[in-house]
Amino acid sequence: MSDITYIVIWLDATRYCFCYLSMILDAYTEEIVGWSVGPTLDTEYPIRALQMTLERIKDVPKEQRTLIHHSDRGVQYASKRYVELLTEHGIRISMTEDGNPKENAQAERLNNTMKNELLKDKHFTTLAEVTAAIIVAVSFYNEERMHMSIDMMTPRDAANCTGELKKHWKSYRQEHIKAKQAEAQAVEAAIPMQQPAVTSLARSV
């Protein structure tokens, strides 16, 4: 699950600008597996987050990877280089169908946690300060912050856990996909099957 969110940098008492945090979340373990922060919305920074993620799976044979990269339809995620990186590494691509935030709910929730919990009340004046704070926040999120959705484990513990994780929160995206599949099946069932014409062939001898 991937997304980009903004963070305020104060230039003085009244003027400010934004920097942009790109993060990639493992939807299964809730672990932040890649991130990057930059001064613009250039594709370069989401690519850095993706490269951090790819480094973690470099020893997994390509044919054994069953990964799906999900994001909104931002130009960064649809860019030629970003798509090439995913396909080169055998990762399937999934994108939201519209602007409904529930279709990327886990990433949206992570943005909220990062900005309104882990970075709450912090006053940044440089990009370097933001980067240093993100390093600490990601470490805390992955290694110390317990999650109800993964049975009160930390994401790092969940990543190291053997067997299937017990997930407590429903996936709005999975519900959406199932609803679409059921709708398609209902339409298909309503279409009468056409019997192929039977042709009799006489062979002369």
Task: Explain the meaning of each model-derived region.
Residues M1-M23, A27-I135, S139-F140:
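RNase H-like DDE/DDD metal-dependent nuclease/strand-transfer catalytic core used by mobile genetic elements
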Residues T87-I91, T113-V205:
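C-terminal domain-tail junction helix/linker
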